[in-house]
């Protein structure tokens, strides 16, 4: 189903062509959702936008548009308000027919994009020999949600995990382990990731304080880069150990990724520097090869270059990112590349993208975008850390959320004198705890920082995962109470929107397509969260005002269809956020 707003835009473009013999299809905000229900369902301020180019009063333009506008099958007669706003109210019978139609559609009216595109979403990207921490939470959850929405829309999505599996830290760690625990460099699973992290910290101290050790570590890096068998084997073991523990987190979060670390692009780095040189973009500055760009300066106001080869002839993140871009466009055939990292890397990616465009790595028809996000803060307003000041491990964060959800569930069961099985308690606690973490993150505008609070994210009221899950479970309880199978509702039954709350719910259900398309374009998952929250509230109002099981047919079946559509929309919407539902809470 083409979204309602797109259908209206198409009719307006046709009307403008008829009225003024011009193509205004590129006009922004041709039709938008009404700001207030008293103005109808949708509005157009196109008459005001065209007043200057057409040299006519807005109301006169609005009158001409309405005269040429053919929407009698969709809307009540359009109304002109104020200076020339055109207000549109959808017809109840049009809405009723559309709801009956999407009730039979497993995709709830959301069509696949045409044409579809090859899209790469680069997200999560932890570092080898370091545990995943709260800083990886947003990238992992946001990236997964964006990938899910794009996949649902029919795009060919490659989810890439650009892990930090190369660099000086490996020389440092391997050199240290050769001294204190050589077995770890030859035997799989000799260490767990926690041990690796502890050894890494000790190695870093030695590296910073001991010049002899620093030189030994550098030699290990050279051996690694040269492909020395023993060093390469040790590196592989360290990577494998980290990889296994990362996968535990990904399994818990139900996140799928294809790993392609920094090391994958190593053979391509000299070629990148050579290409930049051929394009005349390189400048040597204090022995380093750099690209100076317009609009980038340091704190002193001096030009800030992008270094692509250090004075010791080593490469860096920028070189690797340029090589990755080239590979993704040339070999992966990506048409859209999305990087999901914190806002602190915005400057880096802006520079990399500009250099890549100058060098011809990014053609004009390829979209590259940095999906930036803010930091997770504690309730003290500072970056979320442990009491000792350490970064919180992601696994600990998840475990605590699940434990919190369990305590809350057991408390409610005791208050209601309800008996449930151990399996039920375990399952619901796990789903609610993980869902709460995901939803708390995704419901915020990603650009903003947000405060992490177990109390708020696990509350049964407000814009939270438990509220959404409860709304879904409540609808399932209607089917159980009435012994009704939603899948066996009469396919020929009509939807009847006679009550105000029925009409409001029906209209809102039909906006799902618009929201999914919005997230697909603007990559802001919080808009899907806002929609689902508003849908839950509209359903609650409907349920309070419109008896379902106590009604008589055809009203009863119509209201059951609205219940079913709401539950399915919640379930589908939450699944696109990476959140599972529960039938009972």
From Swiss-Prot:
Keywords: Aminoacyl-tRNA synthetase, ATP-binding, Cytoplasm, Ligase, Nucleotide-binding, Protein biosynthesis
Pfam families for the chain: Arg_tRNA_synt_N, DALR_1, tRNA-synt_1d
InterPro entries, per the entry: aa-tRNA-synth_I_CS, Arg-tRNA-ligase, Arg-tRNA-synth_N, Arg-tRNA-synth_N_sf, ArgRS_core, DALR_anticod-bd, Rossmann-like_a/b/a_fold, tRNAsynth_Ia_anticodon-bd
GO biological process: arginyl-tRNA aminoacylation
Annotated Gene Ontology cellular component terms: cytoplasm
Molecular function as annotated in GO: arginine-tRNA ligase activity; ATP binding
Compartments where located: Cytoplasm
EC number, UniProt record: 6.1.1.19
Catalytic activity as recorded in UniProt: tRNA(Arg) + L-arginine + ATP = L-arginyl-tRNA(Arg) + AMP + diphosphate
Keyword Aminoacyl-tRNA synthetase carried by entry: yes
Positions of short motif 'HIGH' region: 126-136
UniProt xrefs under PROSITE patterns: AA_TRNA_LIGASE_I
Gene3D superfamilies: Arginyl tRNA synthetase N-terminal domain, HUPs, Isoleucyl-tRNA Synthetase, Domain 1
Major subcellular site: cytoplasm
Leading EC class: ligase
Family in the record: Belongs to the class-I aminoacyl-tRNA synthetase family.
Assembly behavior: Monomer.
The name this protein goes by in its record: Arginine--tRNA ligase
Annotated organism of origin: Gloeothece citriformis (strain PCC 7424) (Cyanothece sp. (strain PCC 7424))
Gene: argS
């Amino acid at each position: 189903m083409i979204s309602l707003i797109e259908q209206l835009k198409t009719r307006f473009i046709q009307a403008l062509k008829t009225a003024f013999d011009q193509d205004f299809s590129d006009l922004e905000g041709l039709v938008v959702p009404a700001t207030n229900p008293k103005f109808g369902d949708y509005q157009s301020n196109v008459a005001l936008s065209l007043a200057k180019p057409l040299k006519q009063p807005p109301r006169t333009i609005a009158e001409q548009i309405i005269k040429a506008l053919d929407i009698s099958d969709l809307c009540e007669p359009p109304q002109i308000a104020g200076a020339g706003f055109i207000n549109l109210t959808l017809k109840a019978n049009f809405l009723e027919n559309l709801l009956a139609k999407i009730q039979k559609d497993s995709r709830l009216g959301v069509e696949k994009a045409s044409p579809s595109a090859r899209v790469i979403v680069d997200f999560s990207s932890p570092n080898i020999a370091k545990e995943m921490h709260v800083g990886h939470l947003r990238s992992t959850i946001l990236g997964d949600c964006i990938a899910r929405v794009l996949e649902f829309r029919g795009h060919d999505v490659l989810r890439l995990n650009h892990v930090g599996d190369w660099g000086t830290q490996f020389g440092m760690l391997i050199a240290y382990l050769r001294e204190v625990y050589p077995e770890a460099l030859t035997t799989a699973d000799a260490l767990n990731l926690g041990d690796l992290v502890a050894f890494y910290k000790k190695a870093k101290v030695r590296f910073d304080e001991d010049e002899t050790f620093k030189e030994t570590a550098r030699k290990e890096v050279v051996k690694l880069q040269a492909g020395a068998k023993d060093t390469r084997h040790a590196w592989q073991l360290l990577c494998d150990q980290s990889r296994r523990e990362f996968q535990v987190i990904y399994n818990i979060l139900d996140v799928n990724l294809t790993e392609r670390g920094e090391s994958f692009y190593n053979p391509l780095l000299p070629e990148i520097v050579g290409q930049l040189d051929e394009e005349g973009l390189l400048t040597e500055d204090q022995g380093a090869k750099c690209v100076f760009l317009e609009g980038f300066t340091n704190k002193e106001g001096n030009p800030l270059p992008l270094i692509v080869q250090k004075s010791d002839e080593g490469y860096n993140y920028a070189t690797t990112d340029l090589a990755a871009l080239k590979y993704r466009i040339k070999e992966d055939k990506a048409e859209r590349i999305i990087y999901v990292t914190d806002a602190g890397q915005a400057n880096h990616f802006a520079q990399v993208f500009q250099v890549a465009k100058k060098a011809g790595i990014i053609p004009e028809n390829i979209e590259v975008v940095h999906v930036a996000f803010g930091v997770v803060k504690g309730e003290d307003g500072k970056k979320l850390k442990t009491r000792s000041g350490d970064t919180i491990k992601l696994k600990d964060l998840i475990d605590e959320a699940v434990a919190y959800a369990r305590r809350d569930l057991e408390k409610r069961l005791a208050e209601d004198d309800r008996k449930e099985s151990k399996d039920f308690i375990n399952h619901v606690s796990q789903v609610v705890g993980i869902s709460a973490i995901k939803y708390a993150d995704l419901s915020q505008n990603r650009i903003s920082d947000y405060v992490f609070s177990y109390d708020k994210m696990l509350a049964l009221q407000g814009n939270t995962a438990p509220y959404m899950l409860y709304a879904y479970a409540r609808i399932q309880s209607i089917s159980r109470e009435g012994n009704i199978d939603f899948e066996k509702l009469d396919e020929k039954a009509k939807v009847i929107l006679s009550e105000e709350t029925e009409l409001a719910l029906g209209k809102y259900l039909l906006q799902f397509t618009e929201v999914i398309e919005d997230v697909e374009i603007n990559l802001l998952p919080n808009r899907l969260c806002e929609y689902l929250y508003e849908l839950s509230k509209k359903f609650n109002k409907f349920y309070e005002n419109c008896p379902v099981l106590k009604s008589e047919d055809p009203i009863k079946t119509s209201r059951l269809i609205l219940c079913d559509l709401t539950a399915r929309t919640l379930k589908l919407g939450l699944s696109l956020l990476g959140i599972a539902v529960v039938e009972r809470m």
